[in-house]
Design a protein with these regions (language model features):
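Sec-dependent signal peptide recognition
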Residues: 1-2
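Membrane-interface helix termini and inter-helical loops of multi-pass transporters
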Residues: 192-196
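Alpha-helical membrane-spanning segments of integral membrane proteins, especially the hydrophobic core
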Residues: 100-113, 143-144, 148, 155-156, ...
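Perimembrane topogenic segments of multi-pass inner/organellar membrane proteins
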Residues: 5-140
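Hydrophobic alpha-helical transmembrane segments and adjacent short intramembrane/lumenal linkers
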Residues: 171, 175-190, 204, 208, ...
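Short, non-helical or kinked segments that cap or interrupt transmembrane helices
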Residues: 138, 199-203, 265
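Alpha-helical transmembrane segments and their immediate interhelical/interface regions
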Residues: 13, 18, 134-138, 165-167, ...
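Hydrophobic transmembrane alpha-helix segments characteristic of membrane transport
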Residues: 122-161, 224-226
Length: 337
């Protein structure tokens, strides 16, 4: 229902003009230089975010994104509508070429990351402050919920996967990853500002998270782990003269974080896309008559409600799976003789 409230004003005249479903879906799941809130009386209500770019010819430049609305240009900068830089700020240089400047702009996903980090800090500091003030009391309410979640992740996932003697150096990282992914997933489900930022549906974010796990696994791995990589326990004909098994094992070093990255990205992106597509069915069937539109509205609302419940489950499940697999990979790298 909340998705309908935000999409309906923008496409109330869809019966006359029709709607571009692809444009609607991609505009909601992609990053942007503005944070769209809604539309009122045909006017877009959005927050213009600061754009910070560096031109090869003119150096640094900073301005608000509303200068680039509706294909406008500002200081030879504009947002490309097609090509490899579609949706990004590009510059028309003195030779008339379209080039991509150094872009350090504050986009919607970056603002969403700041928001999620602020929420994470608030949750952690509030819980720690309660324990500091009540060291001998049994927690209840929000603090009790946090203790239950932290205890389950640490004792049931981290300690069991890495080992009781080795888990402590990695506990803080894995707990941070779990809550960071969970909060970002939940923010993406909420269509109302300041929610709606598709943070974990951005492959750059999931790549950084997977990269952190990759570093944690390989930087703190034991000698036995690397021995198993380059000289695994396999028949000699699988290692010499062609190093088949060493190649497979070494290839697996990179496929594990790659799988983490794709799994989180694909699951979150798919959920958002399906919900938006189901919502668009209501506006597509406007021109098919009142009866068809009414029937599809009921079907779409029911399916959207089901998908939102499913996406809420996926949001929690993907945070858990990412943490579990990261802990397992770290545990496998801590193998001893």
């Amino acid at each position: 229902l909340m998705w309908l409230c935000f999409l309906a004003p923008a496409h109330a005249d869809s019966k006359k003009e029709g709607i571009d479903v692809q444009d609607i879906v991609f505009s909601h799941i992609q990053d942007a230089y503005t944070w769209h809130i809604t539309e009122w009386n045909g006017k877009e209500i959005a927050i213009s975010l600061p754009i910070l770019v560096k031109s090869e010819e003119r150096g640094w430049d900073m301005f608000l994104s509303h200068h680039l609305h509706h294909g406008q240009a500002h200081h030879n900068y504009y947002i490309a509508t097609e090509g490899e830089h579609a949706g990004k700020v590009v510059e028309k240089n003195s030779r008339g070429e379209e080039v991509r400047p150094v872009d350090l702009s504050l986009t919607k996903n970056v603002c969403g990351l700041f928001l999620s980090c602020g929420i994470l800090l608030f949750v952690v500091l509030r819980t720690a402050h309660w324990y500091k003030r009540h060291p001998n009391q049994v927690p209840s309410g929000f603090t009790g919920l946090m203790e239950m979640i932290i205890s389950y992740i640490q004792d049931g996932v981290i300690k069991e996967s890495i080992g009781k003697e080795e888990y402590r150096p990695f506990s803080s990282y894995l707990l941070t990853v779990f809550f960071f992914i969970l909060i970002n997933n939940l923010i993406g489900i909420i269509p109302v500002f300041p929610g709606g930022a598709n943070i974990t549906g951005n492959i750059a974010v999931t790549a950084v998270l997977a990269g952190c796990t990759f570093i944690a696994v390989n930087l703190f791995a034991t000698k036995e782990y690397w021995k198993e990589i380059f000289w695994p326990k396999a028949p000699i004909y699988l290692k010499l003269p062609l190093p088949i098994m060493p190649f497979v094992e070494f290839f697996g070093v990179f496929t594990k974080p790659f799988a983490l990255m794709i799994r989180l990205f694909a699951n979150i992106m798919a959920g958002h896309t399906i919900i938006l597509a189901l919502t668009c069915l209501i506006f597509i069937t406007v021109s098919m008559g009142l009866l068809v539109n009414f029937g599809m509205t009921i079907v779409s609302v029911l399916f959207c409600a089901f998908m939102n419940c499913l996406e809420l489950l996926v949001a929690c499940l993907q945070a858990y799976i990412f943490t579990l697999l990261s802990a397992n990979y770290i545990g496998l790298a801590k193998v001893k003789d």
